[in-house]
């Protein structure tokens, strides 16, 4: 996938009227949590250029491991993550 594609996926989820952002989560690499990953509802983030924000916290897009739906379907996954990686 090309660079910046995850931002395009998130933009579609947040701004396309056919999508409901409450149905989606992002999984990020988050040092200090169990397993170093954290699941965050897409409705809680604000998109920026090169970063996304959770309230006042700025997080780079490269920390996103996956975009998933509530039902567990993987919408986007970072290149290099095997199928055995569970979110």
UniProtKB/Swiss-Prot annotation:
Disulphide-bridged cysteine pairs = none
Which one Pfam family would you cite for this protein?
MJ1316
Similarity annotation: Belongs to the UPF0248 family.
Put simply, this protein is called: UPF0248 protein TSIB_1445
């Amino acid at each position: 996938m090309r660079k910046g594609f995850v931002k395009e996926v998130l933009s579609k989820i947040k701004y396309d009227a056919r999508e409901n952002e409450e149905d989606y989560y992002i999984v990020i690499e988050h040092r200090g949590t169990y397993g170093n990953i954290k699941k965050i509802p897409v409705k809680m983030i604000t998109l920026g250029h090169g970063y996304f924000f959770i309230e006042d916290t700025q997080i780079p897009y490269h920390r996103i491991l996956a975009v998933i739906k509530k039902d567990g379907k993987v919408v986007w996954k970072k290149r290099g993550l095997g199928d055995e990686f569970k979110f």
